[in-house]
């Protein structure tokens, strides 16, 4: 059995500052006597600040718990800081930096939960988008992510381009 309960609020503090917050609890109970229950608090907080009509900044922090029916679970804490700027009426740019940590737990062995490796994750990216017409937009961007864990480290580069049409 898996249960999660969460309460939250969102709102505008002023015309330039808005945000949201959530607080919850998640629990996974198992029918097996060899697997003990897994539970944790889950939270998220977000703040958006409009500096002016062209520029805005955002910050999000999220703690998530993901149990599985087989006894594995992940508990992650992720943060993201972002900025957006409208260069012209039709061109917008954005950038972000993200960071996080993920802890993995294996199913219990001999009645006790076993901790596995954890990882730290970092990312950054930027994008540029243009509204070509009322129905067509185009965008491009670059994302880099770096995974740091005990079994090895690696980075990933992604370059993307897209055209979207609405009919």
What are these regions (language model features)?
Residues 3-7, 23, 41-45, 77-81, ...:
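Hydrophobic, lipid-facing positions within transmembrane beta-strands of outer-membrane proteins
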Residues 128-131, 137, 141, 155-167:
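Outer-membrane beta-barrel "beta-signal"
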Residues 3, 25-29, 61-67, 99-103, ...:
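Transmembrane beta-strands of outer-membrane beta-barrel pores
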Residues 90-125, 131:
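Outer-membrane beta-barrel transmembrane domain signature
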Residues 15-21, 53-59, 89-95, 130-140:
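Repeated loop/turn-to-beta-strand initiation elements of outer-membrane beta-barrel proteins
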Residues 28-34, 56, 66-72, 102-108, ...:
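Outer-membrane beta-barrel proteins
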């Amino acid at each position: 059995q898996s249960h999660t309960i969460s309460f939250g609020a969102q709102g505008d503090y002023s015309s330039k500052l808005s945000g949201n917050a959530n607080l919850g609890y998640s629990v996974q109970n198992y029918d097996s006597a060899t697997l003990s229950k897994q539970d944790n608090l889950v939270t998220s907080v977000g703040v958006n600040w409009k500096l002016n009509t062209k520029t805005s900044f955002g910050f999000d922090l999220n703690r998530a718990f993901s149990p599985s029916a087989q006894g594995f679970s992940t508990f992650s804490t992720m943060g993201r800081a972002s900025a957006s700027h409208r260069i012209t009426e039709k061109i917008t740019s954005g950038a972000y930096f993200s960071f996080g940590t993920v802890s993995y737990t294996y199913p219990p062995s001999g009645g006790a939960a076993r901790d596995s490796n954890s990882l730290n994750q970092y990312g950054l990216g930027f994008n540029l988008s243009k509204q070509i017409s009322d129905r067509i937009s185009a965008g491009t961007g670059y994302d880099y992510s770096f995974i740091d864990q005990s079994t090895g480290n690696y980075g990933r580069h992604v370059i993307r381009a897209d055209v979207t049409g609405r009919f």
